[in-house]
Amino acid sequence: MDSNLIPYQPVISDIKNLIAAGQNVAYNAANRAMIMTYWNIGKRIVEEEQSGAERAEYGKRLIPVLSAELTKEFGNSYSSRNLHYYRKFCHCFPDSEILNTRVQNLNWSHFRALLRVPDEDARIWYMNEAANENWSARTLDRNIGTQYYRSEERR
């Protein structure tokens, strides 16, 4: 360490901590906004699809048309594949309040993994465990793949 910095070390350390805390708050806010945006996109797609059986053909074309327009302006996050994920996200988590309480330390990769869990009770259990135990998305994915929920259920 440069001896000229020694008297400034406490203020340097404090400011570094402030920056790190601010970056963490910004990341969490952006993550929450992104997840809720994806959920709301899924909700809007579902609402549009459910607006009548006579519109079945219209509904089949909806996602490809949306994707073509949205990817032009906003990039590949709005591909047909991702729009299907957002739609499924809304179906799997129909109550946005569940998301509001859990998105602090879960990112989109966590939720994408959760979409693979067909059983609602298991999905909520995995979501809570991932949030409470700070599982990475990779750990969550592995635990889903090994049906960790079933082994915990027997304990």
Q: Predicted regions span which residues?
A:
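Basic, low-complexity intrinsically disordered segments
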Residues: 1-155
